[in-house]
A protein has these predicted regions:
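Hydrophobic/aromatic-rich transmembrane helices and adjacent perimembrane loops
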Residues: 183-190, 229, 307-308, 312-314, ...
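Transmembrane-helix signature of polytopic, membrane-embedded enzymes
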Residues: 115-122, 141-170, 189, 204-208, ...
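Signature aromatic-anchored transmembrane alpha helix within multi-pass, membrane-resident enzymes
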Residues: 1, 6-16, 157, 256-263, ...
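Interfacial juxtamembrane loops and adjacent helix segments
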Residues: 29-38, 54-133, 174, 346, ...
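Membrane-lumen/periplasm interface segments of specific transmembrane helices
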Residues: 233, 237-238, 250-320, 331-342, ...
Length: 442
């Protein structure tokens, strides 16, 4: 460790301790399991693993009714929405297979332990803990490399503060350490690696790096198909007007290598669809309102991203401060497209969630402008006020995460008046709850 990089190093350690501590504290106890996280949407991402490795039943799922009866994982009784029955009589997943692939090492370790120590049914406590703590470890390992990357562009103090605010001060904290089986924590490191690969590829182009870029884009795509726009990051990195098309034409062979890496990963999803539905491509039924997006995802009283996680305003402001960075066009283009896609989804509430969860996995990209804003502020003459504000909003985010997990901050029915009433409160009274949105307003 370089002596002049100690602040960001200790910040990284603090973030890691906080992530693991929150995972331990927020066990989400249930009647059937001390920790139960492969539920609701997370069940749809995870199901591929026990179905493949334990039950050898990836399309009939005959084993699942007994599992559901034992653990109650699907969320809504009688609504197995995570998998759809197709015309050929087989089930196919609503959610893509990529997250399960990323979870696989931790699942296999859990299964090995369960064979000796517990119930090896794929859903018992050992598996829940394996996925829960595995997600935290997966993210923390990526943060080690992310810190090194950030230090190429920002000073040590800025990176140290940025790691604290970007991870513990936004909603990604919830999805790494509490809702760990959801897709967000598993995709987060892919954004870290695409940033690092984009930067190193443009410095020194090799076939291996080209393939790794394609593999990373492919992995993100088969986790959540909307993550496919991650490709604009390497494509527009170090963008130079007037030289764009010629630059890529000169590197067309390496682009083909990236394409091969992408297709290799994408083919896993295609072969699964062919096996389960008889079709190479299957429509899972998502609907979009691209011409009439839902800006309340960002500003709404229910769970607005910039309302409930106000430190994210630094990510927005920082976009105006990165003009001189080689990643400026790349990051700005990605953030605009990503936000537009997220707010255009028809089911704009994204189920029960803290803030706008569909933006959380791309936090590494948004931290680049965020750190630009932090660097500007901490070197201003108002630094005392700046540090006070940072401390306040960081504390608020952590407090609200505890509110959310204890049912005080509602998952999708908040109103301005209700939020005012429970602000910094550890509980909500019956009078407070009268100000939640009614079922008719959902």
């Amino acid at each position: 460790m370089r002596s002049n990089h100690r602040i960001s190093f200790y910040s990284l350690i603090l973030v890691g301790v906080a992530l693991f501590a929150m995972r331990y504290v927020q066990q989400k106890p249930a009647d059937t399991l001390p920790m139960k996280i492969t539920t609701w949407d997370a069940l749809g991402y995870y199901m591929y693993l026990p179905a493949t490795f334990i039950y050898k039943d990836l399309r009939e799922l005959k084993f699942y009714p007994s599992i559901e009866n034992k653990y109650q994982l699907q969320g809504e009784a009688g609504n197995f929405y995570q998998f759809m029955k197709t015309e050929n009589g087989y089930y196919t997943g609503k959610y893509f297979i990529g997250v399960a692939i990323l979870q696989m090492p931790f699942f296999l370790i859990s299964h090995f332990l369960a064979l000796s120590l517990g119930e090896a049914d794929g859903f018992s406590q050992i598996y829940q803990a394996g996925i829960g703590y595995g997600a935290v470890l997966w993210v923390f390992l990526s943060l080690i490399y992310f810190r090194r990357f950030l230090l190429q562009y920002y000073d040590d103090l800025t990176v140290g503060i940025g790691l604290l605010l970007g991870i513990l001060g936004t909603n990604i904290f919830q999805y790494i350490s509490v809702d760990s089986a959801q897709s967000h924590a598993w995709i987060f490191p892919l954004y870290v690696y695409i940033l690092i690969l984009s930067d190193t590829w443009h410095r020194e182009k090799t076939i291996l790096k080209s393939i790794l870029l394609g593999l990373t884009v492919g992995a993100a795509t088969i986790c959540r198909p909307t993550e496919a726009i991650i490709f604009v990051i390497p494509m527009l990195w170090n963008y130079q007007k007037g030289n764009f098309w010629r630059y890529w034409w000169e590197n067309r062979i390496l682009v083909l290598w990236s394409g091969l890496g992408f297709i290799a990963i994408l083919s896993i999803q295609l072969f699964y669809w062919k096996y389960s539905t008889g079709q190479w491509v299957f429509d899972v039924g998502s609907k979009w309102h691209f011409l009439n997006p839902h800006f309340r995802v960002l500003f709404g009283e229910e769970k607005g991203w910039l309302i409930y996680t106000p430190l994210c305003w630094l990510m927005v402001w920082g976009l105006f401060l990165i003009t001189d960075k080689k990643f400026s066009v790349s990051v700005k283009t990605f953030i605009f497209l990503n936000i537009w896609i997220v707010i255009a989804w028809a089911i704009w509430r994204y189920g029960g969630s803290y803030s706008a969860r569909a933006l959380s996995q791309s936090t590494p990209v948004m931290m680049l402008p965020m750190l630009a804003a932090i660097q500007f502020l901490i070197h201003s003459k108002y630094k005392i006020l700046v540090y006070a504000a940072f401390t306040y909003f960081l504390s608020l985010n952590i407090f609200q995460i505890f509110q959310y997990n204890n049912g005080v901050l509602h998952a999708d029915r908040n109103t301005w008046e209700y939020y005012r009433r429970i602000y910094w409160k550890t509980s909500a009274t019956e009078e407070d709850k009268k100000y939640l949105q009614s079922d008719a307003e959902q």
